[in-house]
Amino acid sequence: MFQRFKLGVVSLCISLLLSTTSFADSWPIAEAGASAAGFSEEGIAKLDAAMNKIVADQDVAGMVWILAKDGHVATYETAGLARIDDQAPMTKESLFRIYSMTKPVTGVALMMLHEQGLWDFDDPISKFVPEFKDLKVMTSYNDAGEMVLEPVKNPPTMRQLLNHSAGFGYGLGGSDPVNEAFRNTQVLASDDLDTLIERVAEIPLMFEPGEAWYYSVAVDIQGYIVQRLSGMTFGEFLEQNIFTPLDMTDTRFFVQPQDQQRFTEVHNWDEERQRLVQRPHRTDRPSYLDPDRLESGGGGLVSSTHDYARFLQMLVNEGELDSARILSPESVRIMRTNSLRDELNLRGSPTSAGQPGQGFGVDFAVISDPSKANSPQGAGTYYWSGAAGTWFWIDPTEDMFLIGMIQAQGPTRPGAPNMRNVARDIIYASLPQ
């Protein structure tokens, strides 16, 4: 069952050729300009000014942003600082904790294995994770946190794992006993994916699979399945099959010693001092400088704006970039198509997903009805974000994407605007009417 994933000779040759390409030689190299990309010059100038103002107002310490349409870069700019404490400037080479923007990368990896016929959407997860064969579901609990458990009636499927309706918790929020168990057993601080799976297997599901949507540990489980099916470590699979072919030379699960000065720090607003301050490093998770840290498919990657823009353009191109094909067009379309029943609410989401007119595909939220979502974006726009504020969206009706890279968690300046909405609204007003 768990056969090793085989690289084709052509893919391997492409990978070897692309691995010699430098950062400066690969798209996006420079701006084509607003007009060449299909926007008004005034609109893109307004976008750049708005993002610079957000930095100047100390809503974030620094930012890098790229807007591209039809493969042409309308703007690729930087502003502010990567680290306040040593006044290091933000640059196009800056590295970021992308947290949950790791998830779409994991989804692409799993879809590559789907194309190999190694799993199907209706397969039970336990076919690939035997530890999940006897899962229990929490039906109720009392004030003391004591749960009433029952055997799962319908074992969760791969489809439900991919759209967060399988019933797993996460531990990022929630005061219920399931999420408390995730925190108490330090699931997300596991040393490796095998340990993570062992811990998750001991925690009941929050609900019967398919009955609700809950943002969950599902994508870490997906990473484990990639590892199990491919016979490689998860990191090795990503490196060989996604990062090297796409020339994503800055993307991995840790920061190399030679890249430490490029690594941005996380900041938040300090109300007492009335300014942004640099946050201390977390002590409950392994350091990003540790090459042996958990290869978390749900939130572990470090990347640059340049690298992630290449990943996004591959998706805009329906699976291909610079002659390197990663996925088939059909697989990309599956990923960006809502697979939830209309009545399921996207609760527990860190983004605006869960509003009317939105659903979920394979590790992306999807805007299925822009009018209900109160968005100017086209139907089928898909997006996600990271816990430190990084965000992106892709509008397939315009062959367009935006990526914004920041590092911010915790309190924000009172009155700070929603920079994502500010950017989005300016961009769509800049298109030909």
Predicted features by range, described:
Residues 1-4:
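N-terminal secretory signal peptides that target proteins for export/translocation
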Residues 8-19:
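Bacterial N-terminal signal peptides
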Residues 20-24:
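Sec/Tat signal peptide C-region and signal peptidase I cleavage site
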Residues 25-29, 35-98, 118-120, 134-141, ...:
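Short, conserved catalytic-motif segment at the N-terminal edge
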Residues 45-52, 65, 71-73, 96-125, ...:
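Active-site SXXK
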Residues 83, 130, 134-377:
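Short, surface-exposed loop or secondary-structure junction motifs
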Residues 392-393, 399-408:
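Short, well-ordered beta-strand elements
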Residues 408-419:
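A short acidic/glycine-rich loop-to-helix N-cap element
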